[in-house]
Amino acid sequence: CSGNTGAALARRNVGESVKQINTAFPHWFNNNYKKFNDKVDSLPVDQHMLIALIAPRPVYTTSATEDLWADPVGSYISISNAQQVYTLYGKKSGLTPEPPVPDTAIIHSILGYHNRTGIHDLTPYDWGKFILFAKYQYGLGRE
């Protein structure tokens, strides 16, 4: 799980805000980022653009159903919006227009995702999905 300034879109203004994360964790970001505390709509980039910079390499994001502070929907929109750049590289993702139901992972794709039932945490379920995704990306266990 990540949330604001992780996978979730900052300019969506849902859950944790740029101002809140800068206030709670002032050591995480440089002072320039704090200039956007009260004008998040002026940010020159948003998270989907940063995810797209990873193309054509694989990316896996995750959320948790009870972690509304981290905006699970915004995280899925973000990774979905990054698909456009992957397409430029000829990489087709297995993402669906709508987020998958909780506890359903998208593994066999260049862009992977799951929304686990529960709170903001990293659980054995999450680690298991990360490992399956990595194995798939490295050609281990492909069907």
Spell out what each predicted region is.
Residues 55-72, 116-118:
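Conserved strand-to-loop "acid loop" that flanks and positions the catalytic carboxylate
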Residues 24, 80, 86-143:
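C-terminal catalytic histidine-bearing segment of alpha/beta-hydrolase fold enzymes
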Residues 11-12, 57, 116, 142:
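Arginine residue identity/basic-tract feature
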Residues 53-59, 107-111:
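Short, proline-enriched alpha-helix->beta-strand connector loops that line the catalytic pocket
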Residues 1-50, 75-96:
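Mobile cap/lid helix-loop segments that gate and shape the active-site cleft of serine hydrolases
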Residues 68-78, 123-126:
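Conserved alpha/beta-hydrolase "acid-adjacent" motif
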